[in-house]
Amino acid sequence: MSHPDTTSKDAVFQWRGIPQPGQLLPLGLQHVVAAVVGVITPAILVADTCGLSSADKTLMIQVSLILTALATLLQLFPIFHRIGSGLPVIMGISFAYIPTLQAIGGEFGLPTILGAEIVGGIVAIVFGVLVKWIRPLFPPLVTGTVIFTIGLSLYPTAVKYMAGGAGSEWFGNAKSWAVALITLAVVVFLNHFTKGITKLASILIGILTGYVIAYFLGIVDLSGVGSAAWVALPRPMPFDIQFVPAACVSLGIVYVVNAVQTIGDLSSTTMGGMDRMPTDKELSGGIVGQGVMSILGAFFGGLPAATYSQNVGIVTVNRVINRAVFALAALILLVAGLVPKFASLLTTIPQCVIGGATISVFATITMTGIRMITEGGFTPRKSSVVGLSVALGVGITQVSGCLAGEGFPAWVNTVFGSSSVVVAALMAVLLNLILPKEPSANG
């Protein structure tokens, strides 16, 4: 990465250097557009699950934007060359955590989520330090199975939102479904029939379209926006923090899985933009930095950060790796996070619009898992690993209380009975270790 400084048009293809202003702004905005929906949506989903007020939901969105910016800057400018990867990546709030966060939040509330995040961040740091030795436990077969399960477990959330949001006066209303389906149609059309910025911003444009329609149908409530401040800094410890061991274990497992996904994203970034694989030091620093920011985020009421695959995709297509481009994107998100009125406006997005926009994201997550699973062909061994892991993971969570009877301590139901991702991850690792290998298998 020791490229010479340059101010030519080729500067955007070098890690260091000063890109021309005419290149810098559009390239930075491209990454903002790709990331912003993914940054704010998890905060909205978790806030709704935990029953937060409009003001607290605004705060969570604000903190999500700020933490995304700081986490990205940490990756671009590592501390002590150990905390952060020093690679061109955009960080954000990951959907991969949502099923487990919703399970914890629904049972224990937001304080327990934040406590589990701190423990999860420590787990990520340990994983990053030991990445060379732990990585072999998570081949594409195992990681793909978990990602596939994550996608499946998010579908009910998307459908509830498309219907108007459980408990909402608009739930099951034909207007909610009309707005959701129009939003989805716009996303699908732009994603498959257009190119360039409109394709990249398909979800954002879909949300804007759905929002306008919902506004004229009387679904949008703007009453809380006027009271929000124009500029404000987030304060530490806005919520209590509690540590529930079972919740910490559940989320810690997801942090491990997400660390493996980070390895994939960093590898795709360096292969696509730098024609090389990442070094062990870069992988370690990237995961450690992710853990550090998750711990910091918990103290400010934020959610876990992770690398953003959609932004990795941009790098592999345009091969722009200049850190000034990514730093500008981070600064734009940071400024947005310092404006509570903007965050408050985002809380007015109707749930049917969010559902219509995100169900395509969740479908993509599911298919990404399938693509990883089928890498190198599909064998009877893979069928057993995936089938049994998903069957137990999804099946157990569909039968309420099946692990809460006599003979089971309460923590068993909390860890294994509420999150399909945790069960699927453990089963996939175990089966991949004990089932006999096949010469043609890639797992």
PLM segments and residue spans:
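Intrinsically disordered, low-complexity non-transmembrane regions of multi-pass membrane transporters
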Residues: M1-L27, L222-R235, M271-P278, L430-G443
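N-terminal signal-anchor module of multipass membrane proteins
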Residues: M1-V89, A96-I104
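Membrane-embedded helical hairpins/re-entrant loop segments and their flanking transmembrane helices
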Residues: R16, P21, A47-G84, G252-R323
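Hydrophobic, membrane-embedded alpha-helices of multi-pass small-molecule transporters
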Residues: G22-A35, G172-L184, A201-S202, L217, ...
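Short, non-helical or kinked segments that cap or interrupt transmembrane helices
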Residues: L59, R82-F95, P136-T145, K199-L204, ...
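Interfacial segments of multi-pass membrane proteins
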Residues: Q102, N191, N311-N322, F326, ...
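Membrane-embedded alpha-helical modules
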Residues: I104-S223, A330, V335-G443
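Hydrophobic, small-residue-rich membrane helices and short re-entrant helix-turn-helix hairpins
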Residues: F193-I205, W230-P238, L251, G264-V288, ...
